[in-house]
């Protein structure tokens, strides 16, 4: 596990009218001065690599399945250069918090589009890197077995 990354299982309730998913409760409210976005990613598409300079990013997949890959590029971190792969989505609702300085990429896996929320804290300026600039030792073509 990369230092500073947290993975929280989210509580869901399925009843006769639908599904309720508790995302940001009293114990984990979104912070002040934050930006949020709801995104859709088409099947097989990926976006990599991005790092937040000053703020953490919280990611929750609402529909479909996302492969989230993280790489620690922080100077002095005990987990520097570690790579972490997570799958989240409608079969396993989770919120992943990615600290500043950790690169992240994501890919829509499965046969349909995915919908996810991203919440960035204040100062959410992003650094976008090409695969060559990022130099992350990860093969996106590897599939979950």
PLM ranges: what are they?
Residues 1-92, 111-145:
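Non-catalytic, conserved peripheral segments adjacent to functional cores
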Residues 96, 104-109, 117:
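Short beta-strand His + acidic residue motifs that chelate non-heme Fe in jelly-roll/DSBH
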């Amino acid at each position: 596990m990369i230092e500073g990354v947290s993975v929280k299982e989210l509580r869901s309730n399925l009843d006769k009218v639908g599904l309720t998913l508790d995302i940001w409760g009293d114990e984990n409210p979104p912070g002040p001065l934050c930006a949020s976005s709801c995104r859709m990613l088409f099947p097989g598409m990926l976006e990599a690599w991005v790092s937040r300079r000053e703020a953490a990013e919280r990611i929750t997949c609402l529909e479909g399945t996302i492969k989230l890959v993280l790489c620690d590029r922080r100077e002095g971190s005990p987990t520097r250069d570690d790579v972490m792969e997570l799958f989240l989505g409608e079969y396993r609702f989770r919120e992943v918090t990615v600290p500043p300085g950790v690169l992240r990429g994501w890919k829509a896996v499965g046969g349909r589009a995915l919908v996810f929320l991203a919440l960035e804290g204040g100062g959410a300026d992003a650094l976008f890197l090409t695969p060559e600039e990022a130099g992350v030792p990860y093969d996106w073509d590897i599939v979950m077995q």
